[in-house]
Amino acid sequence: MTVALEQAPQALHLRAWESAHLRVRGGTLWLTQDGKPDDLFLASGQQLLLLGPACYRLGALDRSGAELILQKN
């Protein structure tokens, strides 16, 4: 999955029993969770386990975009 700077943030909805493993392959990814005050910034090589129930918003921080691998469980 590739996220471009020009795109609106992409939504990722996880239900209560779902999780997703996110790994950034290139660029810098901006990530926020609806209802939470803190944003996260992940660089190439970093990974994160996302837990539901939640809605996450994903976006790129620079013109090169962000390339990521997302595996839902």
Protein language model regions, located:
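Conserved "cap/hinge" positions at secondary-structure junctions
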Residues: 16, 33-34, 52, 60
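Short beta-strand segments in beta-sandwich/barrel cores
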Residues: 28-31, 47
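Structured catalytic cores of enzymes that bind and process phosphorylated ligands/cofactors
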Residues: 46-47, 71
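Glycine- and acidic-residue-biased ligand/ion/polar-headgroup-sensing regions
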Residues: 17-29
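Conserved short histidine dyad/triad with adjacent acidic residue
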Residues: 1-16, 42, 49
